[in-house]
Amino acid sequence: MTLLKSFEDLDYSEALESNKEAQDWLESNNRRFGQLINGKFVTVKNAKLIESLNPSTSELLAHIEIANSEQLESAVKSARKAQPSWEKLGGHGRAKALYALARLMQKHARIISVLETLDNGKPIRESRDIDIPLAIRHFYHHAGWAQLQEKDFSSYQSIGVVAQIVPWNFPLLMLSWKIAPALAMGNTIVFKAAEQTPITAMFFAQLCNEAGIPPGVINMINGDGVIGAELAAHKGVDKVAFTGSTAVGQSIRKSTAGQGKKLTLELGGKSAFIVFEDADLDAAVEGLVDSIWFNQGEVCCAGSRLLVQAEVAKELHLKIKRRIKQLRLGKPLDKSTDLGSLVSKTQFNRVSEMVQEGLNHGGEIYQACDIDEKGNYYPPTLITDVDSSHPLVQEEIFGPVLVSMTFRTQSEAVE
């Protein structure tokens, strides 16, 4: 073998992050989790269960109990009872609790990162270097705002009991976005994690007790869409904060109509990435990589629609194809991996079927490598030769699929 050939064949060696500490923690909890209600972990022997699986291996991580209506009622009542005293604690008192949570999350950041990757399938580099540090910073940040409340935000009032429902693409980060500001302003919480990714929420629930959060201030329930809908419609809730699909958001809006609840809905998207003929194409390609192939494309604001001026479309497409061939698709715990698994077999099948059905309406597909159905690995994908009416241009795919179309003028791109 020549020296040149050796360099051409160079590749990353496998560099797996150890998951022993995370597995030991799951074992210490008998791989089963119930609900956190009024400061206590509640389990029911004959509860209906959800299997939380590692999407890259189908390994069982834990059994998750689905909350029943009585447990939901108890969680809401506990939050209602705890709210007045939590509000009266004042901004400085609440800031102490938020700082305590932030420090504990920071202390356990490594195990949280591994649990997030095991449960979600995202690369450990993203969990370790982006998601978890950002989640921690949200608690530090809002602790600072809590300290300023009485002086700078005295005209603002707490809402009361807030129902919070999050998706599976950024489990702990979404939790922090919801919980930290609500706590800072004196609200109490009934939180529901996504049924696919509840593990880090359960770890956080244990940290709540360790941090000394008063009973009832943070209640956490598990379950599927049925219990989520019941939580959103509950008359004892003053506000619903939901992040997820557009269809579920529409359903929540209907169920809460006429109740006088405050409502925050962060729903799906189909963001456009526009490249003009005078752009730096190499820089544009790197922007595209971060925009659509970050987190396997499972991002509501992913730049999944590429609009490129016709004069440079061919050149840009070639550069994209060369670049995505360099992306590493593989084991999520490998520190050399760029794209991990899609979150579940259901999501893998959904993306695969959407792409196949979409191609029936035309378009050319390029994939950097073969599809690995066993590990739910869907390769970085580029689809070209489509127009604005194409289903893959109109519908959110929520996977590592970039759909490209051309334009001639700026006004045409905007339209």
Label each region the model flagged.
Residues 51, 65, 87-88, 277, ...:
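A structural signal for short, well-ordered beta-strand elements
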Residues 247-387, 407-415:
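ALDH superfamily catalytic-core signature
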Residues 148-283, 407:
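Rossmann-like NAD(P) dinucleotide-binding subdomain of oxidoreductase/dehydrogenase enzymes
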Residues 58, 79, 90, 94, ...:
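Residue-level signal for inorganic ion chemistry
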Residues 59-149:
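Glycine-rich loop-to-alpha-helix module at the N-terminal edge of alpha/beta enzyme cores
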Residues 83, 87, 102-109, 113, ...:
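Structural signal for hydrophobic packing residues in well-ordered secondary-structure cores
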Residues 393:
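Short, solvent-exposed loop/beta-turn-alpha elements that line the ligand-binding surface or hinge
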Residues 1-63, 96, 100, 148-166, ...:
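Terminal low-complexity tails and localization/encapsulation signals of metabolic enzymes
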